[in-house]
Amino acid sequence: MGWLRIERLEPDFAGWADILALIHRAFAYMDGRIDPPSSAHRLTLDGLKAKAGKEIAFAAYDDDRLVGCAFVELRDGHAYLGKLAVDPAAENGGIGRLLVEAAESQTRRVGLPALELQTRVELTDNQRTFQRFGFREIARTAHPGFDRPTSVTMRKDLA
């Protein structure tokens, strides 16, 4: 691994197709493991650009190679971390942690006291990783049409 850096992306960023491909690669391992399937599969280039226009996007680079991304949505009382994705070929290199730290810094910068995220009930490894990053479970919710919890909401207090 080379030199890792995190960049904040602007809506006019030229590499949205690369970000979309990264998200699809990073979320592919969930196929057949989670129900309902990840919304990442429904994300289109236009949808991603629209998301970037409303949220704060970050990209992680290993030298000049795109290896991760994350989106931060500013909400009432907290920020929401979504579409955190790390290239499968670059996993376990600290990229996810750097992206979470960038999201935390942005959340603090705008004066919000907490960062929340959701992961799936079946993805217990992800839950443990986020716990190591200081997040705690605050709720379990069900997707429409499900009578059981499908998502775990986690929160990290930053104040």
Short names for language-model regions:
Residues 11, 21-48:
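Conserved GNAT-fold acetyl-CoA-binding loop/helix
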Residues 59, 65-73, 78-85:
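Conserved beta-strand in the GNAT
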Residues 3, 49, 113-159:
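C-terminal "cap" of GNAT-fold acetyltransferases
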Residues 1-14, 159:
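Conserved N-terminal entry element of GNAT/NAT acetyltransferase domains
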Residues 47-59, 80:
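A short helix-loop-beta-strand connector motif used in the catalytic cores of GNAT acetyltransferases and
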Residues 86, 92-105, 132:
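Conserved acetyl-CoA-binding loop-helix of GNAT-fold acetyltransferases
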Residues 74, 87-93, 121-122:
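Active-site acidic-Proline motif in GNAT/NAT acetyltransferases
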